[in-house]
UniProtKB/Swiss-Prot annotation:
GO BP terms, alphabetized: chloroplast rRNA processing; cytidine to uridine editing; embryo development ending in seed dormancy; Group II intron splicing; mRNA processing; plasmodesmata-mediated intercellular transport; post-transcriptional gene silencing; regulatory ncRNA-mediated gene silencing
Residues annotated as domain Helicase C-terminal: 424-620
Highest taxon listed in the record's lineage: Eukaryota
Annotated knockout phenotype: Embryogenesis arrested at cotyledon stage. Altered size exclusion limit of PD; abnormally maintained dilated PD at the torpedo stage, and increased formation of secondary branched PD. Chlorosis. Altered plastid development.
Source species: Arabidopsis thaliana
Positions of the Helicase ATP-binding domain: 163-327
Motif extent (DEVH box): 275-278
Protein name per its UniProtKB record: DExH-box ATP-dependent RNA helicase DExH15 chloroplastic
Length: 1171
């Protein structure tokens, strides 16, 4: 691994700019934050405020609507929420003193007097000048000073340090807050790369963001030097700078993993920018970012731009280990300081106190309780006043109330107070306008709430006459260009500076709103959280309507990362001196809950690496089968494929494996330290050590007396141990035939008992299946015969060796299914008792197998990953997690309290009773001997020695418990991704897409490897079906829509509206495909693969109608779908149709039909213009 310096801009460092800790150590961020108490202005009273208050609902009502969850899908391939940059707010708030000086303490922007267009042209001229210098004098002309000279302002230190690292040839990881200027680093790298005549790829997670970067880079570098590649756009793809989505780059890298081959799209590429690299934590798309880092040729420099995260050092360490020399640059300082506010019905106050470390006293729950108590005090009857007066010495003033809570408010009263403090939207907007805190992005977590909010406040006039005229003109131009994209219901609010922005709007309309907002012509945008996704739309204020949101039928709380992501929209660099984030009182959360989340801090990046059909096929496929041979072996075209071992090495390079390997190293180091400590402590309590201490502390006479008693006590304890062992063996001998005899007939319930790793007694009821010998030929028996850890030793019964009829014994293993849906493998040692009752071993239905056989077969299907729970000389106790199929059986195992003692069938022999009686007598003898010792002269000093020894024993127990937990953790760690990879490989093998042994790829596999989608194998199966050839283009579009409609919904509040029904041909085709889908699902379930196979005809009629030529107005007339949802479905369908002509081994007739359908459908207002 490359251990490289970590560059961290902090105030605590003794060196001004550099730290050099290990990459594995967490960085200590000490940002600068100057807390400024906001001046509270008296807003101008609005004449219509009382009317608005009567019309406007509380904000909490906007997100409490039933069945109104937000669909967070912006593009067909980019349909997950974006994880934007967020800053370490909690650290900033706690650090209210501005320690730094010089350049670090402020950001200086010297804005020239030219217009924005003139400045961009001037920068473009400077870029061309640098290119000319390099052509004339060589690449030595490129240095940090030349690069930063193209800018009209002084750049920040973290930007300089990152650019210098890039110029040294390192890959760079940059972690910094939102709007801090990370894009400038990528831009400088692009200038350097272009000047050398080489190429740079810039990747983003969203097509909308790619389009935005495309426009920005063309303004700086010129149209000829910048290209665009997304799922449905290819503009100037051979340009020196190419903007693309991450999936496009990943697909390029599949062609030649680890090589910058001239035969791939990476020819002449020197650098790749991974923007928004914190998407690596995205549960559905994070794998793509990891794949790019893993597959990228090592000679290509990576520039990874990330939001503020908790573990940037781990990210940089991982990239350094698998890709090469990597440097980390971090900054936690926001260029525009952020102040947190809290909105209630009657006020808008700073959320925090003046020190920035606690909630503002006037917002605390105690303050609200005090206010309510004062009101109750004034209103109560005279008797209550007298009681209060007597307790307080006759003084009933408010000052005395401050110091007492004799009658605290109940929970219901507190909730009532909270509800009374919930502001209406107009209340908060009125305060924002009065305090000059606009423009604002107002986050509401469902689209219906956003639209309703616009209507509730559309009587506010936030624009002056000049601004209103500009909006009218812009709206007029937009209507001429895109008449169908105008949102008529939003026009009134728009002319007053108010708009909504969410996934239910058309992309063209959203772009129009974004443009107006950037121009300052929209003052408030009510938006869902998708707007926090990296689009260049900063505001002065971000309002967050709630700390929780609906997900299905339940409410879920926002995480700190989500909060910071939205808060990061506040504060416009070069425009605002500070930004504001306003949190709002709701019926569910108050200021104190808000503070907890603000101080929670950001969470670390977590690997979401999972295998897919496309990954397996592209990594493993070798020679391929074709219909027409071209000279070699008939029907085959030879091509090198990777072995499973080679593929495994690639998969095991994931970020998750890197982090877990660090955990493994740290755990093994800690285990070694624990073993060393236990060894030292053991020596301190050995007989020799205690004897040595006794000689030192006791007199000769006392030492002799104590020693004699100790020897007697030791001998009696030895006898007690013998009796205990005799009891165990007698119990062992009683259990063995009992368990053996219960392997036929009904399945009895038993109780297993053991101590867990913390030393706590655990009892588990279970249903008994039988002795391990009854599992003849099973996977379990084979595993146990090969694994030495399951070996059992013969137990020599020395006490009974001379007695006739007392043979030597050996423990046996048995199997049971616990009530906790876990399999247990155990010996007689762990059985507490056996019960008469159990499962009747009778078939549940005619022809079914018996329950015992069913459960044995279920166990045989398991992965055999057993965990050891406890061990002894009489054998160990093992546990294996059950499956969904065993869960229903485990539900029938009763709890122990429902089983009576009378139901027990374990009865002990006379020999056991005799041994138990002798054991009891021996314990009494030991007790008497201890009392005798306690009365001896030297016992007081000796007791101190024993107490210290006992403390040491307890410490050793804790260390051993920690050791067991670490060992269990290490046993659970396995390479992430590989198990899924092999499961998917098995599905591919059985479906005849790829022979996993010979790496021979079949036509089905070729198609699946080339296609883009959630389940590539399923899409390939459908598109290769000959039945599709006879479909007309609109019908084919309808069938394709059924494959990509996941997540699209009708809106439940549109009861009287409708959607177009699909034609009978489309319905019949979808029904025909259902059998094929069911077969694939069964195959996936067999191999535990859980990748959805979408097939839903519900919206096919809408797509078929659009492909048949219906106008947008006809489509949307009384439509039960939001226009944004319909547009997204149509674009997904177009994307799939556009792939078909490029896929291998697809019928040419189908390819022509797909191309025709895509061409017909790609028309306004859903067509997307890139430039």
């Amino acid at each position: 691994m490359n251990t490289l310096p970590v560059v961290s801009l902090t105030a605590s460092s003794s060196f001004k700019f550099f730290h050099f800790p290990s990459l594995h150590r967490s960085l200590s961020h000490s940002p600068n934050f100057s807390f400024t108490k906001s001046l509270i202005l008296n807003p101008n009273h609005l004449s219509f405020k009382s009317t608005l208050n009567s019309l406007s609902p509380s904000q909490s009502q906007l997100y409490e609507e039933e069945d109104d969850e937000e669909e967070e899908e912006e593009d067909e391939d980019d349909d997950d929420e974006a994880a934007d940059e967020y800053d370490n707010i909690s650290d900033e708030i706690r650090n209210s003193d501005d320690d730094d000086d010089d350049e670090e303490t402020e950001f200086s922007v010297d804005l020239p007097t030219e217009s924005a267009r003139e400045r961009v042209e001037f920068r473009w001229q400077r870029v061309e000048k640098l290119r000319s210098l390099v052509r004339d004098f060589g690449v030595e002309m490129i240095d940090i000073d030349e690069l930063i000279s193209i800018y009209d302002f002084r750049i920040d230190k973290f930007q300089r340090l990152a650019i210098e690292a890039f110029l040294r040839g390192s890959s760079v990881v940059v972690s910094a807050p939102t709007s801090s200027g990370k894009t400038l680093i990528a831009e400088a790298a692009a200038v350097s790369t272009v000047a050398k005549g080489r190429r740079l790829f810039y990747t983003t997670p969203l097509k909308a963001l790619s389009n935005q970067k495309f426009r920005e880079f063309r303004e700086t570098f010129g149209d000829d030097n910048v290209g665009l590649l997304t799922g449905d756009s290819a503009i100037n793809k051979d340009a020196q700078i190419v903007i693309m989505t991450t999936e496009i780059l990943r697909n390029m890298l599949y062609q030649s993993v680890g090589m910058a081959s001239s035969g791939t799209g990476l020819f002449h590429v020197d650098a790749i920018v991974l923007d928004e690299v914190h998407y690596l934590s995205d549960i559905s798309r994070g794998t793509v970012w990891e794949e790019i880092v893993i597959y990228c040729p090592k000679e290509v420099q990576l520039i990874c731009l990330s939001a503020t995260v908790a573990n940037p050092d781990e990210l940089a360490g991982w990239i350094g280990e698998i890709h090469g020399k990597t440097e980390l640059v971090t900054s936690t300082r926001r260029p525009v300081p952020l102040t947190w506010y809290f909105s209630t019905k009657h006020s808008l106050l700073p959320l925090l106190d003046e020190k920035g470390i606690n909630v503002n006293r006037k917002l605390s729950l105690n303050y609200l309780q005090l206010s309510a108590s004062e009101a109750r005090f004034r209103d109560d009857d005279d008797g209550y006043r007298k009681r209060r007066s007597k307790k307080r010495g006759g003084d009933t003033s408010y000052n005395n109330l401050v110091n007492v809570t004799d009658y605290p408010l109940s929970k219901n009263e507190i909730n009532k107070i909270r509800r009374s403090q919930v502001p209406q939207i107009s209340d908060t907007l009125w305060h924002l306008q009065g305090k000059n805190m606009l423009p604002a992005i107002w986050f509401i977590f469902n689209r219906r709430g956003c639209d309703a909010a616009v209507q509730y406040v559309e009587n506010f006039q936030l624009l002056d006459d000049c601004e209103k005229s500009e909006v009218e003109l812009a709206l007029k131009k937009f209507r001429v260009l895109y008449p169908d994209a105008v949102r008529e219901s939003a026009e009134k609010g728009l002319l007053r500076g108010i708009a909504a922005h969410h996934a239910g709007c058309l992309p063209l309309w959203k772009s129009f709103i974004e443009e107006l907002f950037q121009r300052g012509l929209v003052k408030v945008v009510f938006a869902t959280e998708t707007l926090a996704a990296g689009i260049n739309m900063p505001a002065r204020t971000a309002v967050i309507s709630s700390l929780s949101k609906k997900a299905g039928n339940e409410r879920i709380e926002l995480g700190p990362n989500e909060l910071y992501q939205m808060a990061g929209r506040a504060g416009r660099r070069g425009i605002d001196e500070k930004g504001y984030t306003v949190l709002v009182q709701t019926a569910f959360e108050g200021a104190e809950e808000c503070c907890k989340l603000v101080f929670a801090g950001v969470k670390p990046l977590v690997s979401q690496f999972t295998a897919s059909y496309g990954m397996v096929l592209n990594l493993v496929a070798g020679s391929k089968v074709t219909r027409k041979s071209s000279g070699t072996e008939a029907g085959k075209v030879l091509q090198a494929g990777r072995s499973l071992e080679e593929a495994k090495k690639l998969v095991e390079k994931s970020f998750g494996n890197y982090v877990s390997s660090n955990v493994t190293v740290a755990a093994k180091q800690e285990l070694a330290e624990i073993d060393n400590k236990i060894e030292i402590l053991s020596s301190e309590i050995s007989d020799e050590a205690i004897d040595k201490k006794s000689r030192k502390l006791l007199s000769a006479r006392d030492y002799k007396e104590i020693t004699v008693l100790k020897e007697e006590l030791r001998e009696e304890k030895r006898k007690r141990a013998e009796q205990r062992r005799r009891m165990e063996l007698e119990r062992f001998l009683a259990l063995k035939p009992l368990l053996k005899g219960m392997e036929e007939g009904n399945l009895p319930f038993i109780c297993l008992e053991f101590k867990d790793s913390e030393g706590r007694e655990q009892s588990v009821p279970a249903v008994y299946l039988g002795h391990i010998d009854s599992f003849q030929g099973s996977k379990l028996q084979k595993m146990m015969s090969l694994d030495e850890s399951f070996a059992l030793n013969l137990i020599e019964d020395e006490l009974a060796a001379d007695e006739p009829g007392k043979p030597n014994v050996k423990p046996s293993y048995y199997v049971a299914l616990g009530s906790d849906n876990s399999w247990y493998l155990f010996t007689e040692k762990w059985v507490r008792t056996v019960y008469r009752t159990g499962f009747p071993n009778i078939a549940l239905a005619l022809g079914d197998a018996l329950p015992r056989e069913i459960m044995k077969n279920l166990l045989d299907k398991a992965d055999m990953q057993w965990d050891k729970l406890a061990e002894s000389e009489l054998g160990s106790l093992w546990r294996l997690e059950g499956s969904l199929e065993t869960w229903s059986w485990s539900l029938n195992v009763p709890v122990l309290s429902s089983l009576s003692d009378e139901d027990e069938v374990l009865h002990m022999s006379e020999e056991y009773d005799n041994a138990a009686q002798k054991y009891k007598e021996q314990r009494s003898k030991i007790s008497r001997l201890k009392k005798k010792m306690s009365r001896s002269e030297g016992f007081r000093e000796y007791k101190k020695i024993l107490e210290n020894a006992n403390l040491t024993v307890e410490k050793m127990k804790r260390l051993k418990a920690r050791s067991r937990r670490l060992i269990n953790r290490l046993e659970q760690i396995e390479p992430s991704g590989w198990k899924d990879f092999m499961r998917i490989s098995n599905v591919i093998h059985e479906s005849r897409a790829l022979d996993i042994n010979t790496h021979l790829i079949f036509p089905l596999g070729e198609t699946a490897a080339a296609i883009r989608g959630e389940n590539e194998l399923w899409l390939a199966m459908v598109l290769r079906n000959k039945a599709l050839v006879d479909l007309k283009p609109p019908q084919l579009a309808g069938v394709c829509a059924s494959l990509v409609s996941e997540g699209i919904k009708v809106r439940p509040w549109r009861d009287n509206n409708y959607i177009y029904e699909p034609s009978d041909t489309v319905v019949d085709m979808v029904n025909f495909l259902e059998d094929q889908r069911s077969s694939l699902i069964k195959l996936q379930e067999k191999h535990e693969v859980m990748i959805p196979c979408c097939l839903d005809v519900q919206f096919s009629g809408m797509v078929e109608a659009w492909a048949s030529g219906l106008s947008w107005k006809e489509m949307m007339m009384e439509c039960a779908m939001d226009e944004g949802d319909l547009a997204r479905l149509l674009r997904r369908t177009i994307d799939l149709l556009a792939q078909i002509p490029k896929l291998p081994d697809i019928d040419p007739v189908l390819q022509r039909s797909a191309a025709a359908a895509a061409d017909i459908m790609d028309r306004p207002p859903i067509s997307e213009l890139a430039g």
